[in-house]
Amino acid sequence: MAHKKAAGSSRNGRDSNPKMLGVKIFGGQAIVAGNIIVRQRGTEFHAGEGVGMGRDHTLFALNDGVVKFATKGKFNRRYVMVESA
């Protein structure tokens, strides 16, 4: 049985809006409390000292300072910290 629909209906024509994910403030850059550091799906980056995590896993600064990225722990997880300037 053929799977061709009459009247030329299209199976395509869907597209989702961009989610603007990724790192917003890089290591060594100054940051103000409340600013977003990383927008992500899941915990690609984990919250370290001076960093909070929103319910959509967004990482944000809890205090003013300088952003630092580090890999540490048994599972080599990537952490984001905010060090006081």
Curated annotation (Swiss-Prot):
Keywords: Ribonucleoprotein, Ribosomal protein
GO terms, biological process: translation
InterPro entries: Ribosomal_bL27 (IPR001684), Ribosomal_bL27_CS (IPR018261)
SUPFAM superfamilies for this protein: Ribosomal L27 protein-like
Region Disordered, annotated ranges: 1-20
Top-rank taxon, per record: Bacteria
GO molecular function: structural constituent of ribosome
Family: Belongs to the bacterial ribosomal protein bL27 family.
PANTHER family xrefs: LARGE RIBOSOMAL SUBUNIT PROTEIN BL27M, RIBOSOMAL PROTEIN L27
Gene Ontology cellular component terms for the protein in this record: cytosolic large ribosomal subunit
Pfam families per UniProt: Ribosomal_L27
Protein name listed in UniProt: Large ribosomal subunit protein bL27
Gene3D superfamilies (alphabetical): 2.40.50.100
